Amino acid sequence: MKYTEKIQEVFLVWLSFFSCIYVLTGVARCDLVYLFVVPSSKSSLTGGSLAAAVAAAAVLWGVRQIPAERVIRCLVVWVGMVPFLLLPKTQFIYAVFALIFFSGWSVCRLLACCGRRIFFPRLPERYWLLLLTLLILLFIGQGLWLYRATSNRLLLFWEDWGIFNEVAWNTLQGRWLQVDVHGGENFFGDHFMPGFFLWFTPLLGVVRSPFLLPVIGALCLWGSAGLIYLLARRCRLSPAESFCCGLVLLFNPVVNNLNLSGMYGTHVISFFIPLLLLFYCLRRSGHPRWAFAVFLFSLTVKESVAVFWVGWSFCMMLERRQEWRNYALTGGIALGYFLLVTQWIIPGFSGGYRYEHQYAALGGNLLEMALSPLLRPAVFWGTLIQEKNLFLVLFLLLPISFAVFRRWRLIPAALLLVVLNMLRGNPEMVNFLLHHNTECVAFLLALCVTSLAEPGTVISDRIFFAGIRLPNAYRKRRALLGGVLVSTLMSYWFFAQGVTGAANLRSLLERNPDCSEFFPEIRSQIRPGACFSGDNWSATMLMLRNRFVPWGSPLADYYLYGSWYLRYGQEQHRKMLQNPEYSLILMRIVQPGAGFWLFRRGPAPEGGPQVMITKEAFAKFPGYEVKSPDPAFQIRVHPLFAEPGQKEAKIVFLIRRTAASAGRSVFLITLSHQQETRRFRLPRTWRGGSTGELFEVTLRLPDGWDNVTGLKIAVEPAR
């Protein structure tokens, strides 16, 4: 019997390590928009099996004092992982979710029956606070670095963060809440957010930087770990346990992805996370009136917050029936506020609540939409029950499922806004990146902490600890917290946008070159305060400096866009080149195939548009570089010899200015073809100009010349 148990123990330990190694090495990248994984070619069954065997041997030696029967009971859950390991690579995302769940579950069970009573070193609370503070600063620094890096590479859209900055900036200029890029409409005709702009607008007037909003966003996201710690202490968790709760927030993939929010930038709704955690801290501290005040203020952050509070109040009424009057009050206030804002205030600015039309398939008014599960079940359930929606729910719940299912009646409150986003019928909006998950994750994190502090044994405890002895309250809390932390770390690796992990931003950052060194040069060509149009990426470099208006607006004095825009706007680019009202004044080549075009209303500048290029981009152009007789220039020669059927041959000279030069000079070209020699004077005079300026000159070869056997370049002062 003992021999059989030992074999089972060895197999389960090996299976747990093999599952981790096989899935971790089998995923090259996770796509967080379309929700699939790209398999890795480095994954090997043989290598994974051997590595798992070595790791299992080391662990078995370490736990040799623990009875095999106990280890088997803890790790038997890994048998459920086997079907997911057999899935084809195209369905490997299911294996990822399964690994997140089973790794946390097994750790939870191990800590419940095999761990020591003292899980953490006995340190004073100030050390835990200091360590948490350092980690908070580290995450904030990483988030701001990623924000700056993506901004410098023009990966961030003007919307949404540019609009929030624009609205506050226009208000400071006397154009109250005006959104120039939307044709000058009032922002409150789109979203009603007085609670944010009330304090952000004067603060922006003092700081005057477009990056004020990302800094505030980073503080709201990762700085909320301090509030999670405070909430855990108010729930009578130890300093070490409270520190782990802070880690759960810091490594939560939803929180980390909200930093860039799918390249829409910082969203105002991130401000709701610290507000909700503060609300719970005040409730736990015995300050219900202050908590009620925070509740009222949170409604003004965004009208969708009221929908969350309606769902929260209803679920709390079901869980705490003896306090139903209090929750009926908060729910009634939230519902009344939502109806007031969406049916009267916002329509007063724009004529209607535009987001209501996104649910037109469910009904013609709010009542029909609310009853659509019964009135239009095919549309409602057909839109809701989809694979992508299931992935999003797993993404939100799995990292903290071991804790939040202790109060499962409150989970619908977290998912209400997520479900409403799914019912919009736009699959692009259902992903792991956008801000629509903010209210959900804020509440789930608060629920995670408060659920761990709940006394007694609930049905989820009996499920997660099935087959082993039910631990006491102290050990159970730490076991559940350990499972939550491990699942969160696993989820962070697969789904968080950061510098590491399967969803890291390295490949995205490598796609576009860093363009920040050219921003001052481009800004110098555009009059401060002037209106301009262009693409949503390039516009960010002029934020809080110029007014961004729609394409085709008569107010636009300038047009600025990059080569990445040409993937979508080739027709607009051709029209701009042919538009007599605007002239090209600057073309900056960052690398072959990537650059900027800047047009200005009015005639073309004397001598044509200025074309600028970097040294690195110049080296990648066709042809070969020749030694220049003037050190102020680089020269590349690209011969285009005549091919059969062609009548002429030519040589293209690409000349880049390496230093500003005030002198005037002329290049003399000597070309040889067999025994014949000809001298040419490049048809322009080279005056002083900016470093990096690029000139293209084409020489047509004499008739009969199908190639060149000799080339010399000289320079002489211009006459």
Model-derived features with residue positions:
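Transmembrane-helix motifs of polytopic, lipid-linked glycan transferases
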Residues: 54-64, 211-236
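Hydrophobic/aromatic-rich transmembrane helices and adjacent perimembrane loops
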Residues: 92-105, 225, 307, 412-463
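Start-transfer (signal-anchor) and selected internal transmembrane alpha helices
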Residues: 1-16, 45-46, 50-143, 325-330
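Extracytosolic helix-loop segments that constitute the early lumenal/periplasmic catalytic or substrate-binding loops
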Residues: 162-188, 195
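Signature aromatic-anchored transmembrane alpha helix within multi-pass, membrane-resident enzymes
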Residues: 71-81, 126-136, 240, 244, ...
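Aromatic- and kink-enriched transmembrane "portal" helix at the membrane-lumen/periplasm boundary
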Residues: 35-37, 82-90, 193-201, 206, ...
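Membrane-interface transmembrane helices that cradle and orient dolichyl/undecaprenyl
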Residues: 64-69, 267-271, 275-290, 317-322
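Membrane-lumen/periplasm interface segments of specific transmembrane helices
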Residues: 142, 170, 323-406, 410-415, ...
